[in-house]
UniProtKB/Swiss-Prot annotation:
Mn(2+) binds at residues 157, 224, 237. Keywords: Antiviral defense, DNA-binding, Endonuclease, Hydrolase, Magnesium, Manganese, Metal-binding, Nuclease. GO terms for biological process: defense response to virus; maintenance of CRISPR repeat elements. This is CRISPR-associated endonuclease Cas1 2. Belongs to the CRISPR-associated endonuclease Cas1 family. It comes from the Bacteria. InterPro entries: Cas1, Cas1_I-E, CRISPR-assoc_Cas1, CRISPR-assoc_Cas1_C, CRISPR-assoc_Cas1_ECOLI, CRISPR-assoc_Cas1_N. Its EC number is 3.1.-.-.
Length: 296
């Protein structure tokens, strides 16, 4: 945070007030995300500000934001990025309506203890399989997974998700021909698939920012592999049923098949807040990795 004071000769002097790690809110206390497009983020002497394409100015409380999703037509100054990093506010570059996740800016953390623990688990095949079982146990609380292999559990999950799609289609009386998404061909998808794609991309961004801020690596996964963010996809599967899948089918029915980007963004945001997603991520990682995470 910056403010102006008068120097000894009456001239304005800039005073930099350092924000310490201890004064920042924990991830669970932050607002999940803010999506911005067609504008500019910069800093003045008092705060981070957003200037939209109509020259409207909005102050951004970045210390209370988990991440900012930057859509098309956005620019951000070097100084603004520096202040957001100090406030532990993640930055993700996404496509229109958060449809595609492109990149993220990693905020610095005070130590690498959490990532070291994560790496040790992933490097040990037996322990990595234990972590995978704990992840699947969230979706199969009544199943005995003790002797199941990773391919077997992945097969169980595939069947569960396909059945879930069919149940949602029946529940909301929505036509369903299967999950389909081709990069660069978003408009070719049906409404339900469009909402699923948009919601999942936004979900990945939120989880990515939280994982970074807690000092874990998004690149070290236990179920997914061959992708750039396997740990993010591992975690996202815990929450998709509530924040993406049910939402997609219910909104398709509510909007009579039309794609209303503003309503989708609003309803997705409500779901994230209602289930207290940021309050769940930390404890869930603690349970999955068998370790109390470092405070953010």
């Amino acid at each position: 945070m910056k403010s102006n004071t008068l120097g000894d000769e009456g001239n304005p002097a800039r005073l930099l007030i350092k924000v310490t790690r201890e004064t920042l809110p924990q991830v669970k206390e932050k607002y999940p995300f803010l999506y911005l497009e067609k504008g500019r983020i910069e800093i003045d002497d008092s705060s981070i500000k957003w200037i939209d394409c109509d020259c409207n100015v909005v102050r951004l409380p970045v210390a209370m934001l988990n991440c900012i999703l930057l859509g098309p037509g956005t620019t951000v100054t070097h100084e603004a990025v520096k202040v957001m990093a100090a406030a532990n506010c993640g930055i993700c570059w996404v496509g229109d309506d958060s449809l595609m996740f492109y990149a993220s800016g990693q905020t610095p953390t005070s130590n690498t203890r959490n990532m070291t623990h994560q790496m040790k688990l992933a490097a040990n095949p037996a322990k990595a399989l234990e972590v995978a079982r704990r992840l699947f146990a969230y979706r199969f609380p009544d199943a005995n997974l003790e002797n199941k292999t990773l391919p077997q559990m992945m097969g169980m999950e595939g069947l569960r998700v396909r059945k879930l799609y069919e149940e949602m289609a029946v529940k909301y009386k929505v036509g369903w021909k299967g999950r389909r998404f081709e990069p660069g061909k978003f408009e070719m998808s049906d409404t339900t698939n469009k909402i699923l794609t948009a919601s999942n991309a936004a979900l990945y961004s939120i989880i990515l920012s939280a994982v970074h801020s807690m000092g874990y690596s998004p690149h070290i996964g236990f179920i997914h592999s061959g992708s750039p963010l396997p740990f993010i996809y591992d975690l996202a599967d815990l929450y998709k049923q509530q924040v993406s899948i049910d939402l997609a089918f219910s909104l398709t029915a509510d909007m009579a098949g039309y794609y209303d980007r503003h309503k989708i963004a609003s309803e997705f945001r409500k779901r994230v807040i209602e289930i207290d997603l940021l309050g769940k991520i930390g404890p869930d990682i603690e349970t999955i990795l068998g370790k109390k995470q470092c405070s953010s």
